[in-house]
Structure formats: structure tokens, C-alpha cells
């Protein structure tokens, strides 16, 4: 089991409030997978207009949480950070939203490396709330500098 704090995360990721969507890393296996948490609070910036009297965490932000988790996995696996290698989302496929995410929920984000070839890496992400999958997606990301294929 692995446990991190927000300082560990902000050392690796360039994202800051309101777009830092990872609160904690709870498990990590080098070059394989990462498990992260995002706590959903009513004070999230998106709830002022999404939707009035019926707040729903936007699906695009769930996908961004998957991408940020993937970024953390790569940065930790290769001893990098945003300071020496940026990570760009290039593709999103096979997205399925199964349930809505609302204030008070805790998203558990599980991301696995699917394929890795030099700078291009494909991931599969599953997001769950209370043991129910709320989103599945396959994403691809590109590093600005080459890394050795595993």
C-alpha cells in the first residue's frame, strides 16, 4: 500500500486549484497501475452552474481525473515531474458513464498502463464511487521527451 499527501502530488503535477483533481495516491505499482482519490465537495467550482439545485460532477472532469492519475503513474514510474517532461492527452475512446457523481462522493480512480511505445502511452481507467463503477475510459497520452519502453 502506498499513501501520499497533496504536497507529493503538487510536486509532480503542474495542475493547481481549481483544476487539480487528485487528493491522494493510495496505491501504486511502477509501470503498471495507480489508485487515486478525489473527494467531491459541494464547494467545487463546477457546481455553481452544473446544475442549479441538482449538482452533478461533470463527466469531462472525471476524464480529467483519469488523465491526471495517468500522469502521476508515468511521472512516478520514470522519476519525472512536469518540470522536466510535460504530458499531453491525445485521445479518449470507449468512454462509458454509468452513474452520476454528486457532492459527498469519493471517486476512486484506478488507472492501468495498456500499451507503451516510447513517448505514447495508452491507459485504461475505471472510476468508482462506493464500489460502483461510474466511468470507464481508454485514454492515450504523449510525453514531450522520450522514455525507454518497458
From Swiss-Prot:
Keywords: Cytoplasm, Lipid A biosynthesis, Lipid biosynthesis, Lipid metabolism, Lyase. GO terms for molecular function: (3R)-hydroxyacyl-[acyl-carrier-protein] dehydratase activity. It catalyses: a (3R)-hydroxyacyl-[ACP] = a (2E)-enoyl-[ACP] + H2O. Involved in unsaturated fatty acids biosynthesis. Catalyzes the dehydration of short chain beta-hydroxyacyl-ACPs and long chain saturated and unsaturated beta-hydroxyacyl-ACPs. Belongs to the thioester dehydratase family. FabZ subfamily. The active site is at residue 50. It comes from the Bacteria. GO terms for cellular component: cytoplasm; membrane. This is 3-hydroxyacyl-[acyl-carrier-protein] dehydratase FabZ. Pfam families: FabA (PF07977). CDD domains: FabZ (cd01288). Its EC number is 4.2.1.59. It comes from Buchnera aphidicola subsp. Baizongia pistaciae (strain Bp). It is found in: Cytoplasm. GO terms for biological process: fatty acid biosynthetic process; lipid A biosynthetic process.
Amino acid at each position: 500500500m502506498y499513501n501520499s499527501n497533496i504536497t507529493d502530488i503538487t510536486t509532480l503535477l503542474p495542475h493547481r486549484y481549481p483544476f487539480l483533481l487528485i487528493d491522494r495516491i493510495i496505491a501504486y505499482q511502477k509501470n503498471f497501475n495507480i489508485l487515486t482519490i478525489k473527494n467531491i465537495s459541494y464547494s467545487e467550482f463546477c457546481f455553481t452552474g452544473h446544475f442549479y439545485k441538482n449538482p452533478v460532477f461533470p463527466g469531462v472532469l472525471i476524464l480529467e481525473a483519469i488523465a491526471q492519475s495517468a500522469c502521476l503513474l508515468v511521472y512516478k514510474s520514470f522519476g519525472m515531474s512536469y518540470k522536466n517532461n510535460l504530458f499531453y492527452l491525445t485521445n479518449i475512446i470507449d468512454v462509458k458513464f454509468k452513474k452520476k457523481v454528486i457532492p459527498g462522493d469519493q471517486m476512486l480512480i484506478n488507472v492501468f498502463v495498456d500499451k507503451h511505445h516510447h513517448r505514447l502511452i495508452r491507459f485504461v481507467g475505471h472510476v468508482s464511487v462506493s464500489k460502483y463503477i461510474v466511468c470507464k475510459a481508454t485514454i492515450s497520452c504523449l510525453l514531450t521527451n522520450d522514455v525507454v519502453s518497458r
